Amino acid sequence: MAGRHALVWLREDAQWQAVTSGAQPRLQQWFAAGLPAVVARGDGSQAPGTLRLGVPLPPSEGKQRLALQAHVAGIARCTAPLTLDAVMPHAPLAVQPALQALLAQAHAHALHPHVFGSFAWQALTGLTYVHAQSDLDLLWSIQTPEQACAVLTLVQRWEQQHGLRADGELRLPDDNAVNWREYAGNAQQVLVKSNQDCRLLPRAALFPARSAA
């Protein structure tokens, strides 16, 4: 099944049910417009063969996040989160140079960040999500502690240079994720998010032991 942050488009005849009270009519409008939902973390309440999905509404609609459950059989298309280069043309013009600089720095380290949150939803919908205080939410897929350190250094330097704030997660080799700011701290345990739950794990357990050459 699709994991957290994946984008899902439903078939016209898909079976789904709003979890947020009173959200059914707005969700019907949303899907009728051909817009996607995002896969949320399972909480054990969903029926077999279903996914928990979310639809975050724009600030003009109160930034409410609408929750629903949908049958997997009703999925027409499922993709990874948008890439930073796909999001960039839809961002406010004032921040596009900073995003271009971040993309160039990431590529120099063979990193290819994906985007979720307000910048992604503005690109996906054409609606206004991004405002002056919006964070840039990034998902970095990494394989080693060295790559994690490279991401931390890159993002912290970028924030200082451009006066913008980046939030987001490091996606670990086992497909779990940890908030990059929390990883950058000194705590011996960090909160790790999977597709089913959240749990505290020792920092040393985040990367599998690599065999000696």
From Swiss-Prot:
Q: Which reaction does it catalyse?
A: apo-[malonate decarboxylase ACP] + 2'-(5''-triphospho-alpha-D-ribosyl)-3'-dephospho-CoA = holo-[malonate decarboxylase ACP] + diphosphate
Q: Write down the superkingdom of origin.
A: Bacteria
Q: What is this protein's gene name?
A: mdcG
Indicate the family of this protein. Answer: Belongs to the MdcG family.
Q: What protein name does the entry list?
A: Phosphoribosyl-dephospho-CoA transferase
Instruction: Name the InterPro entries for this protein.
Output: Holo-ACP_synthase, MdcG_C, MdcG_N
Q: GO molecular-function annotation terms? A: nucleotidyltransferase activity
Where does the record place the catalytic residues?
D135, D137
* This protein's record includes keyword Phosphoprotein: no
**Pfam families, alphabetically?**
MdcG, MdcG_N
Keywords associated with the record: Nucleotidyltransferase, Transferase
Q: What EC number(s) are associated with this protein in UniProt?
A: 2.7.7.66
HAMAP family per the UniProt record, alphabetical: Malonate_MdcG
Instruction: Please give the function described in this protein's UniProt entry.
Output: Transfers 2'-(5-triphosphoribosyl)-3'-dephosphocoenzyme-A to the apo-[acyl-carrier-protein] of the malonate decarboxylase to yield holo-[acyl-carrier-protein].
Q: What organism is this sequence from? A: Xanthomonas axonopodis pv. citri (strain 306)
